[in-house]
From Swiss-Prot:
Sites where the protein binds ATP: G533, P534, S535, G536, A537, G538, K539, T540
Lineage: Eukaryota, Viridiplantae, Streptophyta, Embryophyta, Tracheophyta
CC per GO annotation: membrane; pollen tube tip; secretory vesicle
Domain called ABC transmembrane type-2: residue spans: 859-1056
Species whose genome carries this gene: Arabidopsis thaliana (Mouse-ear cress)
Entry's localization field: Membrane
Protein name, UniProt field: ABC transporter G family member 28
């Protein structure tokens, strides 16, 4: 319903026609003489007859009221009873009958006269100039005393009045007299209309000082000295007829009685009864409202106390849990070490006893030659064993029949041993896991057999110690040796991935620039390959091409996976990519970061003890034991060191046990020792068959020698060398490029490729010729342009631009004479192609060939929930500040924006919508703005975007429920509107849910700065549109789509429903002026909720569509 400037519609008459007729429709069947009215029995019969007529006629006009006034009348019978049910106090009817000497019914207005009155209100007539449309009784030629305000006349005795007649005005000119108390007589008609409940309509008294008829605002007509003050003259909205409303601080049980409010009670304007105050509220005599500020203060103190506890104790909860885990872990480690020490000591004693027995037997057998030759060998084996390693363990004496019999009696199940150790920690029996035992798989525990955390830690550390012992025995272990070791100690084998690339070229679309050209080689499993080259050589582009993505580029050539032309994306579940930036959650500990990645990316059917082993192995190999329980830290809150953070960044990919691991400059910013520690961990992964490729910048010689293969790139993405590190110096020496003594070879080669150093003239080669020499050396086909113009080769190719991880080098398109406009157009086309390819990559899908089943959406959703719960607890201080701001906003708005009865508190609710929308949007931006890089990395790794989004939204539902309560606890108790707390709370929940979804979309689409500006601008602008009073169809149409409009309507309607009786006209006028409907309260909540759902769908679509992979 659109807005209108007037308060009342043209068809407003039927409502009041019903109200009047329902009371006044009677047959003149009762004696109208004064003595009949003095009879109590007759009075009861008279009242009973009136109310029977009312109940019968209600159904007749119910359809008309619903059709014409449905926007402000919810239940016709209920609203009628609230306004005109005088059954409890009918005294004013009997009093009027006595005053009019029995002709009251001939003074009551018909439907036609009621129509004249309300049509006058429609025309804008107010109290000061209340001239109604001329009619049969009051016009320019006939103006009697009954036409004056507060007066009425009667019809002739022989005239039968039809109160239902809404077309003909009866002649009513006889015996004009003041209006009865409890009725009002408008100026311009000569009849009476009953005042509604909640009104106070006594007979007026002349105030000789002001000349007004108190308590009303009309004056006596001039030139009529015998005219006196009558009754009430108007009933309209409170702004036009406030004098007939029962005043605040008093209550009116009937329209002729007004009583002051007693102590302990309060009475609002238009009250028919006094209301009890709450226990802690202060209500003095004549209180207009109860002072419930004490409840607000108590609630404020309670919430403040809880927030302080949350503020100070949130970290302690997680810290206590971490300490308990650390104790369990340390206990497991110590138990494993003690068990191994006991086993070694027991083995040594058994060997000593056996040798002593054999020595004694040798003496008794006169030094048998065979015994004398066997003893030194056994003693030598004992003396050579190291006390700190498993080398001291005895060999398995499988040939001994006694040993075979003993094995059958022994308990070899690790689970039983673990239970024994837990129950009997001092028992000398411990882990009986001997290195070299070929049957160790039979003794190893199954994942389902280990239940407690202590058991899993002991199992993990036992395996790690065995692996350390095996590596100590085989320091120069090869890949084939690892396979053999894996068979011995049950290391799970990983699928192998070999990546071969042949004549690979990458050209930037729109500009035709070569980012890489004629790249041929391969990456083998079990080897660590280093990619080196000067800045702009295309190192990051090369890594991007390996992952099967080159947005905005044309990629030619072949990439073979295990000798087949397949998409590398089909293996993304077993491919790890470590970005150059350390994208790690700063508000999680080192262990929590690693565990989350392991849970989401390891096989779903992998037992938890095996996952514990994987995580503990990575922590051990990366040297992160001492900081495992430390927060990684952020820019604002310092955590672990930069080198440790870099290792955690690598560990996120190692814990998923990849088959292909790609790292972009993992050693940048690390010192030599940290780099060696990281590379040793990577070499251990390579020994398990992992194909590792990493970009490095000028490594030290020690680090350089730890690589297996080297890929050396020149500017323009051309290969100068690809092969074993051990043969790189030999190859360049064959070209006449010899590394001087005491010079690091990689530094020397990169300086030559950069052009800083020039090869000796005797070599007869320049740095621009090195890529061609490599092609010729290996017999690769060389493009004709490179053969003909070696000098211009470098300038014809470009390096990486900013979109590919580097800066552009080489020639620029504008150098060949292209105009500025042409160059600009090429840049635009290139950017469009990049965006287009990104969108295609986001929605493209390839088959899964990794043969790894990771946890599903629901399981990942649970993992995300757990992670977000920890993050929210650690961000409790930020959350406490948000709540305190909401509390202050509620206090300020509740104090300053008092509820206005004329507008049903619309102004205060307008401020509420703006404040709550703004504050909740800004805080909701943090859900996605701060984690964009983390989401992009996790999504690229194959984690579920739906699980991520739903978990974020689920955790934010805590704020959706609590924040309205925090704000309302202050606003409601300081403002105290008539609507219930429940209604306001439900509206605020729907509002917060709606604006949170909008904030998600803004956070995903924009950077944090612009997103905050939009969050501030939208609530203000949309609220202005929703409250605009201009008769503009376009604005009205836009307003219908604004969430602020539905929130305001819900607030106002919930409040307007509490205004009944004398407030009926005010309610209908205010709702019509704003275009609200009293029945739209559920509809408003549905629209707010639907807006929140649709905005979340839009946010999820934008998150998936515009992510950067």
């Amino acid at each position: 319903m659109g807005r209108r400037n007037s308060y009342f519609p043209g068809n407003f008459v039927p409502l009041f026609f019903v109200f009047i007729v329902l009371i006044l429709q009677q047959e003149r069947v009762i004696c109208q003489e004064d003595r009949s009215l003095d009879n109590p029995a007759a009075n009861r019969l008279y009242n009973q007859f009136v109310f029977d007529k009312i109940s019968n006629l209600t159904e007749v006009f119910e359809d008309d009221i619903k059709r014409e006034l449905g926007f402000c009348i919810t239940n016709v019978k209920e609203d009628y009873n609230e306004a005109f049910n005088f059954s409890t106090k009918p005294d004013f009817l009997n009093a009027c009958g006595k005053t009019t000497k029995g002709d009251m019914m001939q003074r009551i207005c018909t439907a036609a006269e009621v129509r004249i009155y309300f049509n006058g209100l429609l025309g804008g007539a107010k109290r000061a100039t209340n001239y109604l449309k001329p009619n049969k009784n009051c016009n320019l030629s006939s103006w009697m005393s009954g036409c004056e305000p507060g007066w009425a006349c009667r019809t002739a005795k022989d005239v039968k009045v039809d109160l239902k007649d809404d077309k003909n005005v009866p002649v009513r000119t006889q015996q004009c007299a003041p209006c009865c108390a409890g009725f009002f007589c408008p100026r311009g008609i000569t009849c009476m209309i009953p005042c509604p409940l909640g009104a106070y309509c006594p007979e007026a008294n002349l105030n000789r000082t002001t000349g007004l008829c108190d308590p009303y605002h009309y004056q006596l007509p001039s030139g009529q000295p015998n005219h006196t003050c009558g009754g009430a003259d108007i009933w309209a909205d409170i702004g036009s007829s406030s004098e007939v409303f029962c005043s605040a601080g008093s209550f009116c049980p009937s329209t002729i009685d007004k009583l002051p409010c007693t102590k302990g009670h309060y009475c609002r304007t238009g009250s028919t009864a006094e209301l009890n105050c709450f226990k802690l509220a202060t209500c003095n005599p004549r209180s207009t409202n109860q002072n419930i500020t004490a409840y607000g203060i108590m609630l404020f103190a309670g919430l403040g106390f809880l927030l302080i506890i949350l503020y100070n104790c949130s970290d302690q909860v997680l810290a206590t849990r971490e300490r308990r885990q650390a104790k369990s872990r340390e206990k497991a480690v110590q138990s494993v070490r003690d068990s191994q020490s006991r086993e070694k000591w027991k083995s040594a004693k058994d060997i000593a006893k056996k040798h002593a027995t054999e020595l004694q037997q040798s003496f008794s057998r006169t030094f048998s030659r065979r015994k004398s030759m066997k003893q030194p060998d056994l003693m030598r084996g004992l003396s050579q064993a190291k006390p700190g390693s498993d080398a001291a363990l005895p060999p398995m004496l499988g040939s001994s029949s006694d040993t075979k019999k003993g094995k059958k009696k022994e308990k070899n199940k690790l689970t039983e041993m673990l239970h024994d150790i837990e129950q009997n920690p001092e028992d000398p029996e411990g882990f009986n896991l001997e290195i070299g035992d070929k049957n160790i798989k039979k003794h190893a525990p199954k994942g389902k057999a280990l239940h407690t955390q202590s058991q899993m830690f002991r199992y993990a550390y036992g395996q790690i110690e065995k692996e350390k012992a095996m590596q100590e025995q085989n320091k120069n272990l090869t890949f084939s040796g690892v396979i053999s070791m894996a068979n011995d100690i049950d290391i799970r084998k990983r699928p192998m991935i070999e990546v071969a690339f042949k004549d690979l070229s990458i050209t930037l679309k729109g500009k035709n620039k070569h980012l890489m050209r004629c790249v041929t080689g391969k990456l083998s499993p079990g080897r660590v390959s280093a990619v080196m080259g000067p800045s702009g050589a295309g190192k990051t582009t090369f890594l991007t091409a390996l992952t099967g993505k080159a947005p905005g580029c044309i990629m030619t050539g072949m990439i073979l996976v295990n000798g087949k032309v397949e998409s590398i994306q089909s293996y993304k579940k077993i491919i790890g990519f470590v970005p150059q930036d350390d994208i790690v959650h700063g508000n999680l500990t080192v262990e929590e970061n690693l565990w989350f990645s392991a849970r989401c990316r390891l096989p779903a059917d992998l037992p938890k003890p095996e996952k514990v082993l994987v995580v503990e192995r990575v922590i051990e190999s990366l040297g992160l034991q001492h900081v495992r329980d430390s927060l990684v830290g952020t820019v604002e809150k310092r955590g672990i060191s930069g080198g440790q953070r870099k290792r955690v960044n690598v560990g996120l990919e190692m814990v998923m046990e990849p088959s292909l691991l790609i790292l972009d400059e993992p050693t940048s910013g690390l010192d030599s020792s940290s780099s060696q520690l990281l590379l040793r961990a990577l070499r251990r992964e390579a020994l398990e068959g992992v194909n590792i490729c990493m970009v490095v910048h000028q490594p030290s010689y020690t680090l350089f020698r730890m690589f297996d293969d080297l890929i050396l790139l020149a500017k323009g993405g051309l290969i100068c060398y690809q092969g074993p590190v051990k043969k790189v110096e030999e190859y360049f020496s064959s070209l006449g490029i010899v590394v001087p003594e005491r010079v690091n070879p990689p530094d020397y080669y990169i300086d030559i490729l950069e052009g800083i150093l020039k090869p000796s003239t005797s070599s007869g080669v320049t740095y621009k010729q090195l890529p061609v020499r490599w092609m010729l050396h290996n017999g690769y086909p060389v493009p004709m342009d490179m053969l003909k113009s070696i000098e211009g080769m470098a300038s014809s190719a470009s390096g990486e631009n900013s979109a590919h991880g580097g800066s552009a080098h080489g020639s620029v398109v504008g150098d060949d004479g292209t105009s500025f406009a042409g160059e600009f157009w090429q840049d635009v086309k290139a950017n469009v192609e990049i965006k287009k390819d990104n969108l295609q990559n986001n929605f493209s899908s390839s088959g899964d060939l990794s043969e790894r089943e990771v946890p599903g959406v629901y399981q990942q959703y649970r993992y995300f929930l757990g992670r977000l719960g920890k993050q929210r607890l650690r961000e409790a201080r930020t959350l406490a500040v948000d709540y305190l701001i909401l509390l202050l906003a509620g206090i300020c708005l509740g104090t300053l924006a008092k509820v206005s009865d004329e507008t049903f508190g619309a102004m205060g609710y307008t401020y509420t919508v703006i404040a709550v929308s703004l504050l909740c949007k800004i805080t909701a931006l943090r859900s996605f703005s701060l984690d964009k890089l983390h989401y992009w990395r996790e999504s690229r790794a194959g984690m579920s975007s739906l699980a991520y989004f739903l978990a974020k939204d689920t955790v934010d539902h805590f704020n959706t429920i609590v924040k309205p309560l925090v704000y309302l606890s202050m606003f409601y108790f300081f403002n105290n509107p008539r609507s219930t707390v429940t209604d306001n709370y439900v509206v605020l929940i729907c509002l917060v849910y709606c604006v949170t979804g909008i904030a998600y979309t803004l956070a995903i689409l924009f950077e944090p700065g612009p997103a905050q500006l939009w969050s501030v601008l939208l609530p203000v602008v949309l609220t202005l549109i929703a409250t605009s009073t201009n008769d503009n169809k376009i604005v009205d149409s836009i307003s219908e789509l604004c969430y602020t409009r539905w929130a305001l309507e819900a607030f106002v309607v919930s409040n307007a429903q509490r205004y009944k009786g004398v407030w009926l006209i005010t309610r209908c006028g205010s709702l019509m002026e704003n275009g609200y409907n009293i029945k739209h309260f559920p509809r408003c909540l549905v629209f707010l909720t639907l807006t929140g759902i649709l905005s979340r769908c839009a946010a999820f679509f934008c998150m998936v569509t515009f992510q950067k992979k």
